[in-house]
């Protein structure tokens, strides 16, 4: 048995152990022995002791400064770190648990389980590093397939791609997070797939609400959640999306499952990158963003894809600062997306939810080659009616509806019915409205909007189309309205 006194003592001469030479907020400079400088992205560990409390923190190497000094970003607050303190090189990048063990669990960026206090210790059998290469070109799936959501406005006008990247754009308070929660519910119910949720720089309260709602809906056990919230250091917020994506990749590549990856909010990912870039001393680019914004975004987005027969479909909430779509953060994200769902403050103010703007939302598969001629023709007609109505609004505001031609009056009337019919009861809104959510099959959606555009329902009052599922609901509502009016 080795005596304690003869054991090696950690010092500057021991490989894999360095000493802190500088602490500037979340940025820590560490000097290592010349022959054992760890590579960029390696995880380092050290312990902060304040009084009787000890906390282990993880740091990730971001730069080699020269003179045997590396610069690392701390993933927890650095209060209590001192110069000369020892830091251990783990010899590998940050890694997270993968596999079925992740379902029904809440993790932080380094893969620690957050919702197992007082429970039995959970054995982690496999971990993957969060920095991984995207699939090779010859491994990618070449077929394009529609991802049906059961939400009318999305399926008809901005159809999602199986294995694609979808952006939910909108300012504060227009319903991005609620729509993401709705999609988690629908995927669990209708697709039976696995969901992975990345909470990137959002409010802790929202994360808590999401977990409680998922437990109530019975979908929590099919979802892995990874959180790096608003109050955490920028290094955590920058890496948490990669931690969640790594868990999703395991289900796709090893379990051969289709996965839905939710990221809320991708703007906070960009914002964290900007903070880290500034802390590392890089010269800022346009509007103060990091000079490697496009590169950082590409590293994340290129890993979200379909391989042969299996897919990761990503739904990303994207906050638009001051509703400015030319801001570099949302503008850089646009290039990677297969579909964009823009949430409109004006539509939300009229009480029409989901508040999707049908004229500015887009999808690359809104094409007869992918959807069929009937779907494409119906979507095109609906958009044409809504666009014509938008053009006529200025005339109506000045002269009134009575000054329009008979043809234009019919167009405006049908457009109003279409606008009302694009609203829909959602499962997540039941607690506010008291009305059960509805799922509308794509075939019904196409037929319904085609009939409204043809004028088959011109005799039905506009209010009968509000917040309903299909035309059967409209007819039922219309009968009730007629009875009430005698």
Swiss-Prot record:
It is an enzyme of class 7 (translocase). GO terms for cellular component: plasma membrane; proton-transporting ATP synthase complex. Pfam families: ATP-synt_ab, ATP-synt_ab_N, ATP-synt_VA_C. GO terms for molecular function: ATP binding; ATP hydrolysis activity; proton-transporting ATP synthase activity, rotational mechanism. Its main location: membrane. The keyword Lyase does not apply. Its EC number is 7.1.2.2. It catalyses: ATP + H2O + 4 H(+)(in) = ADP + phosphate + 5 H(+)(out). It is found in: Cell membrane. InterPro entries: AAA+_ATPase (IPR003593), ATP-synt_VA_C (IPR055190), ATP_synth_F1_bsu (IPR005722), ATPase_a/bsu_AS (IPR020003), ATPase_alpha/beta_chains (IPR050053), ATPase_F1/V1/A1_a/bsu_N (IPR004100), ATPase_F1/V1/A1_a/bsu_N_sf (IPR036121), ATPase_F1/V1/A1_a/bsu_nucl-bd (IPR000194). It is a peripheral membrane protein. Keywords: ATP synthesis, ATP-binding, Cell membrane, CF(1), Hydrogen ion transport, Ion transport, Membrane, Nucleotide-binding, Translocase, Transport. ATP binds at residues 170-177. Belongs to the ATPase alpha/beta chains family. NCBIfam families: atpD (TIGR01039). F-type ATPases have 2 components, CF(1) - the catalytic core - and CF(0) - the membrane proton channel. CF(1) has five subunits: alpha(3), beta(3), gamma(1), delta(1), epsilon(1). CF(0) has three main subunits: a(1), b(2) and c(9-12). The alpha and beta chains form an alternating ring which encloses part of the gamma chain. CF(1) is attached to CF(0) by a central stalk formed by the gamma and epsilon chains, while a peripheral stalk is formed by the delta and b chains. Produces ATP from ADP in the presence of a proton gradient across the membrane. The catalytic sites are hosted primarily by the beta subunits. This is ATP synthase subunit beta. It comes from Clavibacter sepedonicus. The gene is atpD.
């Amino acid at each position: 048995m080795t005596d304690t006194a003869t054991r090696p003592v950690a010092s500057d001469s021991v490989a894999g152990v360095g000493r802190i030479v500088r602490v500037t907020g979340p940025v820590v400079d560490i000097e290592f022995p010349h022959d054992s400088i760890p590579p960029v992205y390696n995880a380092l560990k050290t312990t902060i002791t304040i009084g009787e409390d000890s906390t282990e923190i993880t740091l990730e190497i971001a730069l080699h400064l020269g003179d045997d000094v590396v610069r690392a970003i701390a993933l927890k607050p650095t209060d209590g770190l001192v110069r000369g303190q020892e830091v251990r090189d783990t010899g590998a990048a940050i890694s997270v648990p993968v596999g079925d063990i992740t379902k029904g669990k809440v993790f932080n960026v380094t893969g620690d389980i957050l919702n197992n206090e007082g429970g039995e210790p959970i054995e982690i059998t496999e971990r993957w590093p969060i920095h991984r290469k995207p699939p090779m070109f010859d491994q990618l799936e070449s077929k394009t397939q529609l991802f049906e959501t059961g939400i009318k406005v999305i399926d008809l006008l901005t159809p999602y791609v199986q294995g694609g990247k979808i952006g939910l754009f909108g300012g504060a308070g227009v319903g991005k997070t609620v729509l993401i929660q709705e999609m988690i519910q629908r995927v669990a119910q209708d697709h039976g797939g696995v969901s992975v949720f990345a909470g990137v720089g959002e409010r802790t309260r929202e994360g808590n609400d999401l977990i409680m709602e998922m437990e109530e809906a019975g979908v929590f056990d099919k979802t892995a959640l990874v959180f790096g919230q608003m109050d955490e250091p920028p290094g955590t917020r920058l890496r948490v999306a990669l931690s969640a994506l790594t868990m999703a990749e395991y289900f796709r590549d090893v379990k051969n499952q289709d996965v839905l990856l939710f990221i809320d909010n991708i703007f906070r990912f960009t914002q964290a990158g900007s903070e880290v870039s500034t802390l590392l001393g890089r010269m800022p680019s346009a509007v103060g963003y990091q000079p490697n914004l496009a590169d950082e975004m590409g590293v994340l987005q290129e890993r979200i894809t379909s391989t042969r027969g299996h897919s990761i479909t990503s739904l990303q909430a994207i906050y638009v600062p001051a509703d400015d779509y030319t801001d570099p953060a949302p503008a850089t994200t646009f290039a990677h997306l297969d579909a964009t769902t823009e949430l409109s403050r004006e539509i939300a103010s009229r009480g029409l939810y989901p508040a999707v703007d049908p004229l500015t939302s887009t999808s690359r598969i809104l094409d007869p080659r992918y959807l069929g001629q009937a779907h494409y023709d119906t979507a095109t007609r609906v958009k044409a009616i809504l666009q014509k109505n938008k053009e006529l609004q200025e005339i109506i505001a000045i002269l009134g509806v009575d000054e329009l031609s008979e043809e234009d009056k019919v167009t405006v009337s049908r457009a109003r019915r279409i606008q009302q019919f694009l609203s829909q009861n959602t499962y997540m809104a039941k607690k506010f409205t008291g009305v059960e959510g509805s799922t509308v099959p794509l075939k019904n959606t196409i037929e319904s909007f085609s009939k409204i555009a043809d004028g088959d329902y011109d005799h039905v009052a506009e209010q009968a189309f509000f917040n309903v599922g299909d035309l059967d609901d409209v007819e039922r509502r219309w009968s009730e309205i007629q009875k009430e009016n005698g």
